[in-house]
Amino acid sequence: MPLTVIWVFFDLGSTLIDETAADTRRIKEMISGTDVTEEAYREKRLEMIRKGRNGDLSEMEYFSLTKTPWHSEDEIPYPDAVPTLIELKRRGYKLGVIANQNYGTERRLKNWNLHQFFDIIAASAELGVAKPDPAIFEWALKQADCCPQNAVMVGDRMDNDMAPANRLGIHSIRLKRGLGAYHEPQSDDEIPEHTISKLSELLDLL
């Protein structure tokens, strides 16, 4: 990784934040009162992800399920999130968030004791633009007064994180965890510059 990296931007879900409990709760609520089992839903979701289709909406359509609310209060930071962020700040990196999130991202970051680490928060609901639209990345770069080549994007999604970063010239690092671990590149744009399996490995790249 070039020594000119100044800014490190992070996705939230399945990158810094563990959404497992919230995901499980939504599935249970959606299938309640139907003959769809949680196992069947999860198997179909993985099947569609492996085929290159994003999860949730495809499975909901397949099983004719109604989307239920997402419970952000069930989300928690991964154990490796805070130690990694602390070390990056110690090394002098500027940190930011670029994430597709419901309203209230700053409040949730404060509840998770993560807000203190970030200089810029680009959240889709507040900005009115969502990944993979390059505009949300361009907004973050403008706020940071940073050239793309001096920035890194860390995320789990090939389509929402890696592809737009690559197209803009931002260094891309894929974190293989959560459902994103099952994604396969659908185009050359989605191939990350680096791939890591745990967040602490980021420290060896920077």
Locate each region found by the language model.
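N-terminal helical cap/lid subdomain that shapes the substrate entry/recognition surface
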Residues: 2-91, 106-107
